[in-house]
Amino acid sequence: MKLAYWMYAGPAHLGVLRVASSFKNVHAIMHAPLGDDYFNVMSSMLERDRDFTPVTASIVDRHVLATGSQRKVVATIHRKDQEDEPDLILVTPTCTSSILQEDLGNYVARAAPYTKSEVLLADVQHYRIHELQAQDRILEQVVRHIMDPERQKGTLDTTPTPTPSANLIGFFDLGFHHRDDSRELRRLLHGLGIEINSVLPKGGSIPDLHQLAKAWFNIIPYREAGLMTAKYLEESFHIPYIDRTPIGLIETRKFIGEIEAILQTRGVDRHEYYEKFIIHHETIVSQAAWFARSIDCQNLLGKRVIVFGDCTHAATITKLLVRELGIHVVCAGTYCKYDEAWFREQVNGYVDEILITEDHTQVADTISRLEPAAIFGTQMERHVGKRLDIPCGVISAPAHIQNFPLSFRPFLGYEGTNVVADLIYNTFRLGMEDHLLELFGGHDTKQIGESQMAESISNSKGCQWTPEAEKELAHIPRFVRSKVKRATERFAQEHGYPVINLECIYLAKQSTSVDIETIQHLLFNDETEVQ
């Protein structure tokens, strides 16, 4: 645990609450002080569901600190059991209330005999793991809690469904495009002739857990949550699982191939049908294959980008950029340090550098050092891109409200491939808008350009520019101006120029090979919008 003003993944109790709020008729009781109870507000703002978030805060105040928490926690459990009649009540402390070292397990044990609902204490180390790890562990804990007693008594129905079926495990509230990904994956499986046995936890219920063992296989679209549940089902009921994420045409084809292989082990051969299905969707349904061969996409060849996010999205987007669009990924990274080995294995050979860190300042420093043409990352990388004047597309959580759209925008499957291709192309294209306004004119272009230039110069780190130097810098196209400006300032600091004048600019051009021919090459050959 460390103090930080930005975290890529939240504290563990957020993962617990996301599991509870994703299920139908499951209620969470959070034992926490005021200040830790922001989940309801955050969930209401981002998810925009019609229903209230099923989370109740058992507030730790001065009275509780003086008399103990047992009476309050037990009373809250009994009250929510009577009011809401949930199938399961999930009790969790937060990292703050864990400092009190209270025996919440004992409180739950005292309350459970007098409730109609199942009551379960979230078994996670709040100081050792973060949000993504917690939701993975808690989902597995809930599944075990429901299925193990029936399995031990031999009353659990494990008869496979008569036709091929799958469990979709790993869709959560506040997940990055999870609602739309779930719809698209259902549609893809329907086209492949696969029935949906259960979906967990988003949209699922506790009674659905009794049916999990009837599926032919499990699908885990995101490594961050659901993998522990899939491994438990494989060990206990011998149900295979697929953990490949179908983002991009190549990965979607491999995903379908893994489904075909599982069906063949059950004596079902659909090879010919699946081949026709893939060809039809790659040539007609998905526009991404055609787009990759278009002149617009050809202009993206060799572009230098940085990718950063969770393991699943960072790895799959990196491979899509390199294999399907020919874009040069100079650095790919993830904040999921616990899954570093898998991530390195996935992106090895596709990138120049690999960055594994939870520190957003290291990511910002890497972006500043490598100066890519675009960034594909989280909301934090979007902020960094705005500061450095580098366009950024958000491809991973954490994200803001614009990445919880009301419209249908999946990342998985063939429709998701179209969405991702649009995101990639528009990220580059929008980076040219300011320059095109400057070049061809627009409303108040001159005033806007001058004010932005003045702001840019005023933000220089310890470097003063003469009016002549500012005028010369203004002649450089906007999309490479910030790069030329940083290179010139770096040259001035290294060679002891207190003020940047025309002589300093010309010497910097010579030393870094940033001359007029280079700028013209960038302007007329390297950018997509200038023909």
From Swiss-Prot:
Subcellular location: Plastid, Chloroplast
Gene3D superfamilies: 1.20.89.20, Nitrogenase molybdenum iron protein domain (3.40.50.1980), Proto-chlorophyllide reductase 57 kD subunit B (1.10.8.550)
GO biological process, one term: photosynthesis, dark reaction
Keyword Phosphoprotein: no
Record-listed [4Fe-4S] cluster binding positions: D36
Keywords: 4Fe-4S, ATP-binding, Chlorophyll biosynthesis, Chloroplast, Iron, Iron-sulfur, Metal-binding, Nucleotide-binding, Oxidoreductase, Photosynthesis, Plastid
Pathway the protein takes part in: Porphyrin-containing compound metabolism; chlorophyll biosynthesis (light-independent)
GO MF annotations in UniProt: 4 iron, 4 sulfur cluster binding; ATP binding; metal ion binding; oxidoreductase activity, acting on iron-sulfur proteins as donors; oxidoreductase activity, acting on the CH-CH group of donors, iron-sulfur protein as acceptor
Catalysed reaction equations from the record: chlorophyllide a + oxidized 2[4Fe-4S]-[ferredoxin] + 2 ADP + 2 phosphate = protochlorophyllide a + reduced 2[4Fe-4S]-[ferredoxin] + 2 ATP + 2 H2O
InterPro entries reported in the protein's UniProt record: ChlB/BchB/BchZ (IPR050152), LI-POR_suB-like_C (IPR013580), Nase/OxRdtase_comp1 (IPR000510), P-CP_red_C (IPR042298), Protochl_reductB (IPR005969), Protochlorophyllide_Rdtase (IPR016209)
Keyword Manganese: no
Coiled coil: none
Gene Ontology cellular component terms for the protein in this record: chloroplast
Cross-referenced SUPFAM superfamilies: Helical backbone' metal receptor
Domain of life of the native organism: Eukaryota
Enzyme Commission designation: 1.3.7.7
Cofactor binding mode and count: Binds 1 [4Fe-4S] cluster per heterodimer. The cluster is bound at the heterodimer interface by residues from both subunits.
UniProt record similarity statement: Belongs to the ChlB/BchB/BchZ family.
Subunit organization: Protochlorophyllide reductase is composed of three subunits; ChlL, ChlN and ChlB. Forms a heterotetramer of two ChlB and two ChlN subunits.
Function summary: Component of the dark-operative protochlorophyllide reductase (DPOR) that uses Mg-ATP and reduced ferredoxin to reduce ring D of protochlorophyllide (Pchlide) to form chlorophyllide a (Chlide). This reaction is light-independent. The NB-protein (ChlN-ChlB) is the catalytic component of the complex.
HAMAP family: ChlB_BchB
Protein name: Light-independent protochlorophyllide reductase subunit B
Naturally occurring in which organism (per UniProt): Nephroselmis olivacea (Green alga)
Lineage: Eukaryota, Viridiplantae, Chlorophyta, Nephroselmidophyceae, Nephroselmidales
